[in-house]
């Protein structure tokens, strides 16, 4: 069987790397004769990753509009726009989805879990339609979609997938309620199964009593109006330094040169100016970041797959949440997201994160014990999710 992954944003997004690495390993462990092709949006970025089970890779960024349209195509776009802007957009996006090599593979797996969570989803839908025209089976793996994101157009497109794997119950319940797809299942994100690169344990020391911290400039887009997530994060961490003897390790998890986490974290470290604050290099792989996170005493983070690295290694984790996925994952692990997720929309000063941090700190060891008991079966469930793929 020839499988193909698409909507992979590149390995400088180490959540994307973790999904591709684990999902490809799960396929190969069960069916080693299978071939897996990766359609990547950023081949240059993939050079920083570690994807041993990918047989072939091709850069194909269907999210970029075609640079040139023919006269006939322009006329068609103009005609469609008079009838419906949606129809015109769908046709325009479909022009970017043409690729002769798409005929070569049997099953296409969308590994971009957030594709239907933000915006109108027209680009993702256009690519799915193109694959369906070619008679291909399509799978939406590890998705998160809020009920508020489910437009009539999205539901129509979601119905055409041969399998949808929701990664948390809030998404599963929303899709079930909307009857978005009869082939809908619920399994943990495959990144919960990511292995740890033990070599980095020897080369990168994590001090005792270390708090791991991750934030990104992306979070600022969802924060309370008029607030600076960088300023609030800096003062919040200054409070921790002043009120405890904790060391603070700033851990990037998306390391793109222009807008990676390392930029905002580097500025925060410089502003704090403390010998107890350090920044993890932006050159690590997903497995290496997981190794670092696993040795922290606790973790506070915004990037979903950084928090998954912490959860899966039984590190007590307080999430800075900005979408349904953070609430859903916490709920599935602990039975509730209360006290475990700080909604970024409610952060307008340091008072909220400090208050939630202190509450979390008082229950930290309770959370650790729960993770130690809960995680083995949860990770095994994530591994077993691959059997759903072989049933379609």
Indicate residue ranges for each PLM-predicted region.
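Active-site anion-handling motifs in enzyme catalytic cores
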Residues: 1-392
């Amino acid at each position: 069987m020839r499988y193909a992954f698409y909507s992979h944003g590149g390995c400088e997004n180490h959540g994307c790397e973790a999904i591709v690495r684990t999902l490809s390993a799960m396929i190969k462990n069960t069916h080693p004769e299978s071939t897996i092709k990766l359609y990547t949006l950023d081949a240059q970025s993939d050079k920083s990753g570690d994807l041993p089970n990918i047989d072939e890779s091709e850069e194909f960024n269907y999210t970029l509009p075609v640079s040139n349209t023919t006269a006939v195509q322009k006329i068609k776009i103009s005609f469609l726009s008079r009838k419906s802007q949606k129809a015109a957009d769908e046709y325009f996006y479909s022009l970017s989805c043409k690729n002769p090599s798409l005929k070569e593979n049997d099953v296409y797996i969308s590994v971009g879990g957030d594709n239907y969570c933000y915006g109108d989803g027209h680009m993702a839908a256009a690519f799915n339609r193109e694959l369906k025209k070619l008679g291909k089976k399509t799978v939406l793996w590890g998705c998160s979609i809020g009920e508020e994101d489910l437009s009539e157009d999205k539901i129509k497109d979601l119905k055409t997938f041969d399998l949808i794997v929701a990664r948390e119950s809030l998404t599963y319940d929303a899709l079930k309620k909307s009857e978005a797809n009869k082939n809908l299942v619920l399994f943990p994100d495959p990144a919960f199964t990511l292995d740890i690169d033990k070599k980095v344990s020897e080369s990168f020391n994590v001090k005792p009593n270390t708090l791991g911290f991750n934030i990104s400039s992306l979070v600022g887009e969802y924060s309370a109006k008029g607030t600076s997530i960088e300023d609030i994060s800096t003062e919040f961490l200054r409070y921790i330094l002043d009120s405890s003897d904790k060391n603070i390790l700033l851990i990037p998890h998306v390391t793109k040169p222009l807008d990676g986490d390392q930029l905002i974290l580097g500025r925060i470290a410089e502003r704090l100016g403390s010998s107890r604050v350090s920044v993890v290099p932006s050159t690590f792989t997903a497995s290496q970041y997981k190794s670092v996170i696993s040795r922290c005493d606790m973790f506070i983070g915004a990037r979903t797959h950084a928090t998954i690295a912490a959860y899966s290694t039984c590190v007590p984790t307080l999430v800075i949440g900005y979408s349904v996925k953070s609430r859903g994952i916490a709920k599935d692990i602990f039975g509730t997201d209360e006290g475990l997720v700080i909604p970024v929309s409610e952060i307008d000063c340091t008072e909220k994160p400090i208050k939630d941090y202190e509450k979390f700190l008082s229950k930290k060891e309770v959370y650790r014990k729960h993770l130690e008991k809960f995680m083995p079966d949860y990770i095994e469930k994530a591994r077993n999710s691959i059997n759903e793929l072989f049933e379609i």
